[in-house]
Swiss-Prot record:
Family affiliation: Belongs to the Cu-Zn superoxide dismutase family.
Protein name: Superoxide dismutase [Cu-Zn], chloroplastic
EC number, UniProt record: 1.15.1.1
Keyword Cytoplasm: no
Enzyme class per UniProt: oxidoreductase
Keywords: Antioxidant, Chloroplast, Copper, Disulfide bond, Metal-binding, Oxidoreductase, Plastid, Transit peptide, Zinc
Co-factor remark: Binds 1 copper ion per subunit.
SS bond partners: 120-209
Molecular-function GO term, any one: superoxide dismutase activity
Cofactor(s) recorded in Swiss-Prot or TrEMBL: Cu cation; Zn(2+)
Protein function: Destroys radicals which are normally produced within the cells and which are toxic to biological systems.
Length: 217
């Protein structure tokens, strides 16, 4: 049986063994591994280890910030614009400006559907993926869509910035395509003792609503 020398090539996933025949005292091996050309002079009786090197691929960088907007309208003169932004997997910042409100507190919620074919009534109930009862934004037990109250000044304008970690713009519980709704009355945050306290916060009618849609960064 003829004697052989062995050389190997190693990558992150495979090792290859190739015999060097004894018929040549100094065989010249020309080959290519993973797109890298090799030219190796091997002497009989020696063992060679060759390592293939891959060319780095360009990285694809995705924008870490997501932004969205909702334009609120209704059957009255109440209207507004709400912008939402989220960095990476952090909380979502919500900037609210609504006009035409009666001065005072108004419940402000994210509802489960982005359907406004029947006005704000067709937006469904509060967004509640965890099937909990209604509460305040800071409560452990709350709907994800429970954003508390906004306050309108004497001119009927409510301007506020909210930060919440249960209304992401991506992922299985993304709020994109759902609706923001401003209500007629104050939200009792689930603590008012009314029969509707643990479902709607007894916040009354729906004055204006808008579907959350993604916007350019």
């Amino acid at each position: 049986m003829a004697a052989h020398s062995i050389f190997t090539t190693t990558s992150t996933t495979n090792s290859f063994l190739y015999p060097i025949s004894s018929s040549s005292s100094s065989p010249n091996i020309n080959s290519s591994f993973l797109g890298v050309s090799l030219n190796v002079n091997a002497k009989f009786g020696q063992s060679l280890t060759l390592y293939a090197v891959t060319t780095p691929k360009p990285l694809t960088v995705f924008a870490a910030t997501k932004k969205a907007v909702a334009v609120l309208k209704g059957n009255s003169n109440v209207e507004g614009v709400v912008t939402l932004s989220q960095d990476d997997d952090g909380p979502t910042t919500v900037n609210v400006r609504i006009t035409g409100l009666a001065p005072g507190l108004h419940g402000f919620h994210l509802h489960e559907y982005g359907d406004t074919t029947n006005g704000c009534m067709s937006t469904g109930a509060h967004f509640n993926p965890n099937k909990l009862t209604h509460g305040a934004p800071g409560d452990e037990i709350r709907h994800a869509g429970d954003l508390g109250n906004i306050v309108a000044n004497a001119d009927g304008v409510a301007e506020v910035t909210l930060v919440d970690n249960q209304i992401p713009l991506t992922g299985p519980n993304s709020v994109v395509g759902r609706a923001l709704v401003v209500h007629e009355l104050e939200d009792d945050l689930g603590k008012g003792g009314h029969e509707l306290s643990l479902t709607t916060g007894n916040a009354g009618g729906r004055l204006a609503c808008g579907v959350v849609g993604l916007t350019p960064i």
